[in-house]
């Protein structure tokens, strides 16, 4: 059950509301939504951000504030995705602390000029096994368009594509742990 939600609407008309969202079992704060500059003829895209205060199994005196970002980038043009990434980096680079950035990036890691690689480099984020097999999230051709990226100080302990059909893409799930926190040395890492 996810009692805490934050939804940002990036495109709306009489027929639909498109956007991004975050769902959590735990309350979050500092939530905001950002819609990218319009990129006609495709619908507007954007991202939402919220912070969760995480205190793994009570092992820390004070919780760690982790920022979670849910994003949806343009599906049709690499140039638009790159512009959206630059817009997003301009905002997210000003946010301090650990970050988990996830969503539908509509791009892969394989190409030399990958927008995803560019984003990871700009924000110093890491992806889970970028060349791994069996993690496709779209279609029957093995396209991996949906990703989770994490900042230094966090690490993946589990990562999987959820086989349930909930949209035209499969969801991605990860277990993320706090890495090398001095208060956690000698004990199992906290997981989120």
Model-derived segments and their meaning:
Residues 1-65, 160-163:
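Structured beta-strand-rich core segments of catalytic domains in phosphoester-bond hydrolases
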Residues 20-22, 47-51, 70, 147-148, ...:
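Conserved hydrophobic/aromatic beta-strand scaffold that supports enzyme active sites
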Residues 32, 69-72:
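Short beta-strands and strand-loop turn motifs
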Residues 35, 79, 83, 90-99, ...:
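Metal-dependent phosphoester-hydrolase catalytic domains
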Residues 53-58, 87-94:
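A generic secondary-structure signal
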Residues 65-67, 99:
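The start of beta-strands in P-loop NTPase/AAA+ ATPase cores
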Residues 71-73, 103-105:
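Active-site metal-binding loops of divalent metal-dependent hydrolases
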């Amino acid at each position: 059950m996810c009692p805490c939600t934050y939804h940002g609407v990036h495109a709306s008309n009489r027929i639909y509301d498109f956007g991004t969202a975050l769902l959590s079992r735990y309350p979050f704060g500092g939530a905001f939504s950002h819609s990218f500059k319009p990129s006609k003829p495709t619908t507007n895209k954007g991202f939402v951000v919220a912070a969760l205060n995480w205190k793994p199994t009570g092992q820390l005196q004070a919780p760690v504030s982790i920022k979670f970002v849910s994003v949806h980038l343009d599906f049709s043009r690499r140039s638009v995705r790159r512009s959206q990434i630059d817009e997003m980096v301009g905002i997210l680079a000003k946010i301090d602390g650990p970050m988990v950035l996830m969503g539908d990036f509509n791009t892969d890691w394989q190409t030399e000029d990958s927008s995803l690689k560019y984003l990871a480099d700009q924000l110093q984020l890491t992806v889970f096994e970028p060349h791994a097999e069996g993690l496709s999230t779209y279609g029957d051709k093995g396209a991996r368009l949906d990703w989770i990226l994490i900042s230094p100080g966090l690490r993946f302990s589990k990562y999987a594509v959820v086989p349930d059909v909930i949209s035209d893409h499969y969801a991605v799930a990860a277990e993320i742990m706090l890495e090398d926190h001095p208060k956690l040395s000698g004990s199992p890492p906290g997981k989120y």
